[in-house]
C-alpha cells in the first residue's frame, strides 16, 4: 500500500539468496537452477553520474548452465612419465654432443679422434647420477603402480613384488656406486653443486605443514646443549613434516584421486571453501611444474658443464640456450599433463560460482543505494555493496566472493575464461617451436642441427595435444553460449 515517504521511514530487506546459515545443493548435475528474487528496497537515482543500483526486487540471480565438455583421453601417469623421461634423455644426449663432439670427418693424416664423441672424457658415474635424477618421476610411477593394493592373483602379486624389488634395488645400487666414485674423485664444492637443488626441493613443495607456523626451523636453530632431549622430539616432528610432504607430493603426481571434483552448491560459505581448496591445489601444481622444470634444466644443462675440465672447450652460449629450451619445454609438458581440459573446466565452474566485485569511486555513487555486504548472501549482478569502507559493484552472475580479497579477484580473473590457460600454453609452445625452427634453418653446426631437430619432436607432440584440447573446449563452450544468452534474456 502506498504510504507517505519520510526521512524516518526504515527500509527493510532480506538476503538475496538464502538466510544466514542456510545452504542448498543443486540436483541437476551440471546446472544450478536457483532463480531467486533478491532484496526489496528502494533505490535513489543519480543525476549525471552514470552509475545506478537497480532495486534488488527487480533483479534475479541467473541460474548457471554449466557446459558439459566431452571426455578427452587422458594419458596414463606411467606413460607420461616415460615420455617426459625420454625427452629429458634426448636433451641430455644432445648436450653431451655439444660438449664432447669431435671432428671425426678429418682424414687419417691429422685426426684428433676416430669417433664422433670423446668417450674417454665422459664420466659415466656422473652420467648415471644425472640420469637417475631425471628419471626420478618415472621410477616413482613404476613403484607406485607396482605397489597397488586390492584383490589380485598370486602370480600378479609376485610379479608386482619382483618388479618393485628389481627397480628399487637396481636404482639404489647404481646410485650408491656412482656417488661413492664421485666422492672419491671430486671436491666437496663440486658435490655440493651436484646435490644442493634437493635441499630446496622438499621445503619449496611443503604444503600440508606450514613450518613458519610450527616454528620448527626457529626451534632447531635456537636449540642449546641442554635441549638435546627435546630436540630429538622436534627432529621427529620435522621428519614427520617431510614424510607428509612427500606423501602429498606422490599422491598429487601419481594417484588417480589427485583430480578434485566440483560441488555445484548454492551455499556461499561452501563455495568460498571450495575455491580456497582449488587455489591450494592449483598452487601446488604450479610449484611442481616450476620445481621439476628447473631441476631438469639444471641437471641437463649446468651439471655436465660444471664437471668439464678447464682445458676443454665447449659452446657456452648453446648451453645457456639449451637450459632455456629445456626449462620451457618441460614446463609446458608438465602443465599440459597437470592442467588437463577437465581441470580447466573445473576451475571455470568454481570461478563462475564465486563471482567478482569491481571497486568503484564512492563519489560517483553517493546518491545510489548501497547495501552492507554480508558473507551469507549471494548477490546478483549490478548491485552496489559497502565493505571495509569501500564501495564495490557485483560483476558476475553469482557473487559470493569477499570484495576486499585480492585472491578471489585473481581467481575469477584467471579462470572466468576456461580457455585462458590453454591459450597461454599454446602461445608459449608455439613461440618455442617458431624459435627452434628459425634456429634450425640458420644453424651451421652439425651438433646444433641434430639437437634442435631432436628436441622439436617433443614440442610437436605437446603442441598437438594442447591444440586438440583447445579446439574441443572452444567448440563445447561456443555451443553452450547461445542457450545461456537466451536464459539470461529470459530472466532479465
UniProtKB/Swiss-Prot annotation:
**A Pfam family per the record:** Tmp39
Glycosylation, residue list: 8
Task: Say which family it is in.
Answer: Belongs to the TMEM39 family.
Q: Which intervals of the chain form a coiled coil?
A: none
Keywords attached to this Swiss-Prot or TrEMBL record, sorted alphabetically, are: Endoplasmic reticulum, Glycoprotein, Membrane, Transmembrane, Transmembrane helix
* Taxonomic classification: Eukaryota, Metazoa, Chordata, Craniata, Vertebrata
Region entry Disordered: which residue ranges? 1-53
What is the protein name for this chain? Answer: Transmembrane protein 39B
TM region(s), chain numbering: 77-97, 115-135, 153-175, 185-205, 288-308, 322-342, 421-441, 447-467
Q: Where is the composition biased (Low complexity)?
A: 31-53
GO annotations of cellular component type: endoplasmic reticulum membrane
Q: Which InterPro entries match?
A: Uncharacterised_TMEM39 (IPR019397)
The annotated topology with respect to the bilayer is:
Multi-pass membrane protein
The gene designation is: Tmem39b
What this chain does, per the entry, is described as: May protect the cells against DNA damage caused by exposure to the cold-warming stress and facilitates tissue damage repair during the recovery phase.
Q: Where in the cell is it found?
A: Endoplasmic reticulum membrane
Amino acid at each position: 500500500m502506498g504510504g507517505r515517504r519520510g526521512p524516518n521511514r526504515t527500509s527493510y530487506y532480506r538476503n538475496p539468496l538464502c538466510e544466514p546459515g542456510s545452504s542448498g545443493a543443486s540436483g541437476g548435475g551440471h546446472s544450478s537452477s536457483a532463480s531467486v528474487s533478491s532484496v526489496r528496497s528502494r533505490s535513489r537515482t543519480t543525476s549525471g553520474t552514470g552509475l545506478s543500483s537497480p532495486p534488488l526486487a527487480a533483479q534475479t540471480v541467473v541460474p548457471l548452465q554449466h557446459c558439459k565438455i566431452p571426455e578427452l583421453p587422458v594419458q596414463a601417469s606411467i606413460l607420461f612419465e616415460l615420455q617426459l623421461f625420454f625427452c629429458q634423455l634426448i636433451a641430455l644426449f644432445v648436450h653431451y654432443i655439444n660438449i664432447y663432439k669431435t671432428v671425426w670427418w678429418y682424414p687419417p693424416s691429422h685426426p684428433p679422434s676416430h669417433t664422433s664423441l670423446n668417450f674417454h672424457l665422459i664420466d659415466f658415474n656422473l652420467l648415471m647420477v644425472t640420469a637417475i635424477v631425471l628419471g626420478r618421476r618415472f621410477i616413482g610411477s613404476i613403484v607406485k603402480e607396482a605397489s597397488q593394493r586390492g584383490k589380485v592373483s598370486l602370480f600378479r602379486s609376485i610379479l608386482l613384488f619382483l618388479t618393485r624389488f628389481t627397480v628399487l634395488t637396481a636404482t639404489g645400487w647404481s646410485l650408491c656406486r656412482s656417488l661413492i666414485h664421485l666422492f672419491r674423485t671430486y671436491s666437496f664444492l663440486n658435490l655440493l653443486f651436484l646435490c644442493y637443488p634437493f635441499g630446496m626441493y622438499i621445503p619449496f613443495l611443503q604444503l600440508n605443514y606450514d613450518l613458519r607456523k610450527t616454528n620448527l626451523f626457529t626451534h632447531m636453530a635456537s636449540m642449546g646443549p641442554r635441549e638435546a632431549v627435546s630436540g630429538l622430539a622436534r627432529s621427529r616432528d620435522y621428519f614427520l613434516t617431510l614424510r607428509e610432504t612427500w606423501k602429498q607430493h606422490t599422491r598429487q603426481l601419481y594417484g588417480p584421486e589427485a583430480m578434485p571434483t566440483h560441488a555445484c552448491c548454492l551455499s556461499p560459505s561452501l563455495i568460498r571453501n571450495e575455491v580456497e581448496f582449488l587455489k591450494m591445489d592449483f598452487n601446488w601444481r604450479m610449484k611442481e611444474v616450476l620445481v621439476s622444470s628447473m631441476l631438469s634444466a639444471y641437471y641437463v644443462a649446468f651439471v655436465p658443464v660444471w664437471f668439464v675440465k678447464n682445458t676443454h672447450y665447449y659452446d657456452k652460449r648453446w648451453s645457456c640456450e639449451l637450459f632455456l629450451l629445456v626449462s620451457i619445454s618441460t614446463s609446458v609438458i608438465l602443465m599440459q599433463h597437470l592442467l588437463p581440459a577437465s581441470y580447466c573446466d573445473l576451475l571455470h565452474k568454481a570461478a563462475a560460482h564465486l563471482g567478482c566485485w569491481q571497486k568503484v569511486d564512492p563519489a560517483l555513487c553517493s546518491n545510489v543505494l548501497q547495501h552492507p555486504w554480508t558473507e551469507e548472501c549471494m548477490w546478483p549482478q549490478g548491485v552496489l555493496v559497502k565493505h571495509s569502507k569501500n564501495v564495490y559493484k557485483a560483476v558476475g552472475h553469482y557473487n559470493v566472493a569477499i570484495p576486499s580479497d585480492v585472491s578471489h579477484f585473481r581467481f575469477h580473473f584467471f579462470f572466468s575464461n576456461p580457455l585462458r590457460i590453454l591459450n597461454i600454453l599454446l602461445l608459449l609452445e608455439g613461440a618455442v617451436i617458431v624459435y627452434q625452427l628459425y634456429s634450425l634453418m640458420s644453424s651451421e653446426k652439425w651438433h646444433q642441427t641434430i639437437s634442435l631437430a631432436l628436441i622439436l619432436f617433443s614440442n610437436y607432440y605437446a603442441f598437438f595435444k594442447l591444440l586438440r584440447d583447445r579446439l574441443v573446449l572452444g567448440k563445447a563452450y561456443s555451443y553452450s553460449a547461445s542457450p545461456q544468452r537466451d536464459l539470461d534474456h529470459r530472466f532479465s
